[in-house]
């Protein structure tokens, strides 16, 4: 009985054991399915987070590109304004330098004119001084000649007076003769 009952029991035990195994396996499968569901949810959440991050990264990249374009535009505009102001200032400096050169040339011309006028004035002044000296010399010569003439005339008059007899002549006649000799009778 022992063999039979052992065999019979073994079959029942094997069925029980198989049912238990099956139950354990079903539990494991259900657990694995649940776990798979959780993992799928986790993967879906990770995928959603990844998509959200990608969208955010795309927006940030778009914002970055917009900001970069805006900064480039501002930089370009500022560079253009700077170059324009630099050109304007350079033109002003060049114009002012031209004006300075022109004014320097005008000053040089005026200085030359002043020098020429000064030389001309000095030349004319020297010429006038020379004329004055010449006229003074002539006046002195004429004065000397006149003095000589007067002296000669006086000497001649004295000679004539001495020659003329004072006794025979009357005073009015003598005056007339003196006037005739000196040429004062016409006055």
From Swiss-Prot:
One GO cellular component term noted in the UniProt record for this chain: motile cilium
Q: Where in the sequence does UniProt note compositional bias of the Basic and acidic residues kind?
A: 10-23
Q: Where is this region: Disordered?
A: 1-23
Transmembrane stretches, by residue range?
none
Sorted keywords for this record are: Cell projection, Cilium, Coiled coil, Cytoplasm, Cytoskeleton, Flagellum
Q: Which domain of life is it from?
A: Eukaryota
Q: Where in the cell is it found?
A: Cytoplasm, Cytoskeleton, Flagellum axoneme
Q: Which family does it belong to?
A: Belongs to the DRC12 family.
Assembly and partners are described as: Component of the nexin-dynein regulatory complex (N-DRC).
Tell me, in a sentence or two, what this protein's role is: Component of the nexin-dynein regulatory complex (N-DRC), a key regulator of ciliary/flagellar motility which maintains the alignment and integrity of the distal axoneme and regulates microtubule sliding in motile axonemes.
Protein name, per record: Dynein regulatory complex protein 12
Native organism:
Tetrahymena thermophila (strain SB210)
The lineage is: Eukaryota, Sar, Alveolata, Ciliophora, Intramacronucleata
């Amino acid at each position: 009985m022992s063999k039979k009952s052992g065999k019979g029991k073994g079959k029942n035990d094997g069925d029980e054991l198989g049912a238990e195994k099956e139950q354990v396996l079903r539990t494991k499968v259900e657990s694995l399915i649940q776990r798979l569901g959780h993992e799928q949810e986790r993967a879906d959440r990770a995928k959603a987070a990844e998509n959200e991050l990608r969208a955010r990264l795309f927006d940030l990249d778009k914002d970055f590109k917009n900001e970069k374009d805006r900064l480039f535009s501002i930089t370009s505009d500022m560079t253009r304004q700077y170059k324009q102001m630099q050109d304007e200032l350079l033109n002003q400096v060049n114009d002012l330098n031209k004006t300075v050169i022109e004014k320097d040339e005008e000053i040089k011309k005026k200085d030359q004119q002043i020098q020429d006028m000064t030389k001309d004035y000095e030349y004319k002044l020297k010429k006038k001084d020379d004329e004055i000296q010449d006229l003074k010399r002539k006046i002195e010569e004429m004065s000397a000649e006149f003095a000589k003439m007067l002296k000669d005339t006086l000497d001649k008059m004295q000679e004539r007076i001495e020659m003329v007899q004072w006794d025979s002549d009357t005073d009015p006649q003598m005056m007339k003769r003196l006037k005739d000799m000196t040429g004062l009778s016409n006055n």
